[in-house]
From Swiss-Prot:
It is found in: Nucleus; Chromosome. Keywords: Chromosome, Developmental protein, Differentiation, DNA condensation, DNA-binding, Nucleosome core, Nucleus, Spermatogenesis. InterPro entries: Protamine_P1. The gene is PRM1. Residues 1-61 are annotated as: Disordered. Testis. Protamines substitute for histones in the chromatin of sperm during the haploid phase of spermatogenesis. They compact sperm DNA into a highly condensed, stable and inactive complex. The keyword Protease does not apply. This is Sperm protamine P1. It comes from Dasyurus hallucatus. Belongs to the protamine P1 family. GO terms for cellular component: nucleosome; nucleus. GO terms for molecular function: DNA binding. Disulfide bonds: none annotated. GO terms for biological process: chromosome condensation; sperm DNA condensation.
Length: 61
């Protein structure tokens, strides 16, 4: 049983390490995506009316 416990501990550690690596990568990608989304949102705010009209036309069609 002691051996099994040691193995489970090592496995959980390896999994935690992998998750940490994925999180660091996701953080970098998220920051890039957020910056892009913010720029798109700013443009959408300026053209909010035109976008609404287009969506209404699309729904009618």
């Amino acid at each position: 049983m002691a051996r099994y416990r040691r193995r489970s501990r090592s496995r959980s550690r390896s999994r935690y390490r992998r998750r940490r690596r994925r999180r660091s990568r996701g953080r970098r990608r998220r920051t890039y995506r957020r910056s892009r989304r913010h720029s798109r949102r700013r443009r959408g705010r300026r053209r909010g009316y035109s976008r609404r009209r287009y969506s209404r036309r699309g729904r009618r069609r």
